[in-house]
Amino acid sequence: MLTGAASAFSADTGFARSLQSPVSRQSKPLVSGLTQDTRLYGSTAVEIGGKAKLDGLKISVDCSDSSSMKWNVTVPEEGEFDLFLSCAVSVPGFKLEIRSGSSSVKVELRVTEGIYQQTEGGWYFNFERIRLDGKLHLTRGVNPVSVQVSGPEQSGVVRFRCLEILPVPGSAAIIPSEESVRAHRANTDWFVKAGYGVMFHWTDFTQPRQGEKKPYKDAVDAFDVNAFSSMIEEMGAGYVVLTLNHAHPHCAAPIQSWEAIHPGWTTRRDLLGELADALAARNIRFLLYINSPTLTKLGNIGPTGLYQLTFSEEQFAEIHRDVLSEIGARYGKRLAGYWFDSWYQSLAAYPDVPIDAVYRACKVGNPERITCFNFWIFPVLTPYQDYWAGELNSLHNPFTSRYIQQGAGKGFQAHALLSTLESWVHSKPGPIPAPQFSAEDLIAYVRANVEHQAVTTINIGIYQDGTVEQSSMDMMRQLRRAIRGK
């Protein structure tokens, strides 16, 4: 966790923020008080010892027998604290002890479960967020907090993502009841009824099948909305998710608040509005993908594995509020949802960001607009979303219920995001490769999800002119006939 004035707790990381001048404020600050949740990541530990090893991306720590981590945590008042552990456990027999001074909490870890098919040496592991039995006592001031892992002398590790420390009196306010959480979520019935939809990473990196790539704004002007929408209808997709930005902050619409943050990156043509209208005429819903770090100019990964910051926490929230409010008011019910990327990184960089305020901004113009924040394989650390982002890429285990029972997305509407590409963007010149899975396997997966009221989104490689490769089209036609019966 980063040290900051808005934090009730701080963990000593030695990592400083870089701030630019504030963005214009249209209303009262979104970060107005102290939050009482602190998260300790392996990348910000002051010590990593024994057999513990920070992974190459600095986003989790592999712990086998005799592994340890340590942080220095500052708290304003002495008290008792609840503990939540986000980890993946591959084999039984691991034990964990969290200690500060004479206070300690011990736990025997069970094997974690979820929908990911775990692969040796791969990234797909079933992380869960576990509430630990017992309280940790911390005194006012600086407290050394250590995590010690012991386990069987065999193959297998505990993958540590983070430890959350919450004051007991504040836990009820920070962790709403299941009833109150569900009460503020949008209805996902239409999403479930759709069964499956498609996503396109159509960006300034997207290549044509042949010839020279056009500048992004020229590609926007040349985009054939009717041909694209007819293609989606032929695929049988119930909705489309389109990248508004990705690696670069382009925006295919004249959004003034976006232009204020990223001058020159918006377009005169309102391609988003035209697509929303053309798809709606075919009873197909329209959603937007937004990469939050790109929107808010998060810089390179720093020495702690966290983004180097351009804006303050308050500015990060205000940028989202301003942009989402304008987009929401402009498109109203024509915009059915959002899929926000890179939020496990965003929340690590901005630990006190008021996600509830960002979530509320998502509803401007359409209270039933569905929203998710992508935490990838890691547990979702906010109740303020309507469905699980479900970034899978390849085929994994299908869901067994509408609301996820175990794993990273526990409690949320079940949703899987696949990709016909091994990556997400067709960024190399030439033909798009054939899908990485067969039509038969995709049909079986989508059908199994539909039977349990889970939703599947298929990211399809797309050319700059808005067309797809014939092999992808053939696969989607087969899926349509199998699922839609026509």
Please state what every model-predicted region is.
Residues F15-E77, F81-K486:
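Mature catalytic domains of secreted/periplasmic carbohydrate-active enzymes
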Residues M1-A11:
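N-terminal export signals
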